[in-house]
Amino acid sequence: LDGEEINIIVNHWPSRSGGEKKSSPYREAAGRLNRKIMDSIIKINPNAKIITMGDLNDGAYNKSVKQGIGAKLKKSELKEPRDIYNPFEQMAKDGHATLFYRDSGDIFDQIMVSQQLVPADNNDYGSFKYWKAGIYNKPFLIQKTGQYKGYPLRNQNGVPGFSDHFPVYIYLVKEVK
């Protein structure tokens, strides 16, 4: 990215088909594999900047993310190069969602950043650093009527839409010289 090496891992983890409990081991395995990939990158370069992202089909609080990846809720919890920050965990705690199922919202779509992308202080922007994250849920992406009012506007019954998940994003910023 602008000459700066940033490692990006893109995920789409196994669905919850068959039930959350029955399918959870598959996502837990995906979380462990994700952690293994990140650790391999860090072993080669302890200063590696890593972004792992995608539709995890699990929330930030699930075992696959908390234990499998080892994601941290707060930036202040990042102590070593292998630590990874998940800004979407706090958003979930605050009641935000990227998808809805049976009128219950959750955030399965997440972007996490390694310690090397989190600024150590407010002056640490000589290279790309994480600034903020969000859920892109503009009005044109939201179902306006019917049973799924308020849900992401998806293609269904011949009505064009976008997706059953709202997109997520992060800002990486760098000092301009």
Predicted regions and their residues:
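Alpha-helical membrane segments in multi-pass integral membrane proteins
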Residues: E5-N7, R27-A30
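Second-shell loop/turn segments in exported
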Residues: S17-R27, T52-M53, A97-L99, Q156-N157
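Active-site metal-binding loops of divalent metal-dependent hydrolases
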Residues: W13, D55-L56
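Beta-strand-turn-beta hairpins that frame and shape the catalytic cleft
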Residues: L1-S17, K174-K177
